[in-house]
Amino acid sequence: RERDDILLVNIDDAAIEEIGAWPWSRDVIADILIRLREAGGTHAVFDIEYLSPGQTGVNRDYVRSQFPQDYREVQEEILSYIDEFATAVHDGSIPKDYVPEISEEMISYINSRLGGLSDEITGNIFRDNDAYFADAIAFFAHTYLTINTERINENEDAVKAEQWVRDNLLFSNVVDPHRLIDAENEKTRKDSQFEKGISPAILSLIQRVAGAGFPNVYIDEDGVRRRIPLLVEHEGAYVAQLVFAPILHILDPERMVRKDYRLILENALDPADPASGVRRDLVIPLDEDGRLLINWLKKKFSVKDNPEEGSFKSISVFALYACDDIEEK
């Protein structure tokens, strides 16, 4: 059935036309995430993989607001100093013999102020966009990024991120006595060009999330995505599917038990009203390959011109991006 509390925020042609060519710098995504939180969003799931560091960017807030103010203050101060000096020389308040000495003092002072302004510009005009995005992720609170279930990265930073994820984000409350999940994972992995393993988002981002899951999708022979594996085993723990991960955090099952063609969420919160505190076992039926079969609604997934007619409510990400410009005006 349809749920009105799910919103798709689309990076669509309209947004790219207005904001600029994709990929965008991560400060843009960070600002959008902040706006989504302010608009009442409770959980944000990114299906974008951040597997490598982003580029340092220009601190637009500083350029727009603080820099003009700082520059104006220094400019007014220097011009006032020069004007006072010129007036004093003109009316004789400063004897001519002292003009060279005072001129040197003035030059030294101006150099000092310009040097300070230069240091301030250098220190503020550039921004670590990954750090800024990480702060936005933490501000939103319930943000979910990706853990690819293939070993794509093998550098030192990737190894650290993998270990952190293994210690903090994977699920250990899965009971699979017949190792069905692992066998099904192997069947899915047979055509992969990468080794078995995990590749999470970069450490500086993944450390700030509420959770993470795998975005890997599998397409049926007719080109339709209708089957989704829910769990992937990794070194005795489990990575949840990207959207399944926040669902698990909301439902908070005591255990997940895999039996034949079922995944049982034992003693989970009632999905109809998790806040009620009522708990019961939930049974998720699976197909012969251990995947969830999506029961698509008989309507288009997304309708560009009339989002209300799609399977889920959707908006262009530009609607959130434009809030900054509207607020400034």
What residue spans do the PLM features occupy?
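Non-transmembrane functional regions of envelope-associated proteins
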Residues: R1-S302, E328-K329
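Short intrinsically disordered coil segments
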Residues: W24-R26, P307-V317
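A Trp-anchored, charged/polar loop motif used as the substrate-binding/catalytic surface
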Residues: F312-K329
